[in-house]
């Protein structure tokens, strides 16, 4: 025993279970949480944008990242469906506009103006009734 308590193994202690494998590969916070968006970058932005040098926990950054990823996936899925309905393969700002304004919850959440998004197609019911009445009158006369 060379100057210390315990066993003298001559090297680093095992510190737990020993397996035949080498050291574990490093995993990012995003990989551990099963996310595609970068947790480290979101944490950095949270730290930069807080007042009075507040601390930001790692779990808070993971949670915010998960929420951002979910909302992005939801919007892209709806926009992809809108693009597919119009038989095109590229999502444009118009498709994003149709997707967001077509979903009631996303519409209340995202109140921003989307550049080149256009307007939603809408015809007042009073105008539709007049057109339908004219068609009926033509059918009766014929």
From Swiss-Prot:
It holds the Pfam family Histone_H2A_C. One of its GO terms (cellular component) is nucleus. It comes from Pyricularia oryzae (strain 70-15 / ATCC MYA-4617 / FGSC 8958) (Rice blast fungus). Keywords: Acetylation, Chromosome, DNA-binding, Nucleosome core, Nucleus. The keyword Nucleus applies. It is found in: Nucleus; Chromosome. Variant histone H2A which can replace H2A in some nucleosomes. Nucleosomes wrap and compact DNA into chromatin, limiting DNA accessibility to the cellular machineries which require DNA as a template. Histones thereby play a central role in transcription regulation, DNA repair, DNA replication and chromosomal stability. DNA accessibility is regulated via a complex set of post-translational modifications of histones, also called histone code, and nucleosome remodeling. GO terms for molecular function: DNA binding; protein heterodimerization activity; structural constituent of chromatin. Belongs to the histone H2A family. Disulfide bonds: none annotated. This is Histone H2A.Z. The modification N6-acetyllysine is found at residues 5, 12. Acetylated once deposited into chromatin. Residues 1-19 have a biased composition (Gly residues). Residues 1-35 are annotated as: Disordered. The nucleosome is a histone octamer containing two molecules each of H2A, H2B, H3 and H4 assembled in one H3-H4 heterotetramer and two H2A-H2B heterodimers. The octamer wraps approximately 147 bp of DNA. H2A or its variant H2A.Z forms a heterodimer with H2B. H2A.Z associates with the VPS72/SWC2 subunit of the SWR1 chromatin remodeling complex. Also interacts with RBP1/DNA-directed RNA polymerase II largest subunit. The lineage of its organism: Eukaryota, Fungi, Dikarya, Ascomycota, Pezizomycotina. Its main location: nucleus.
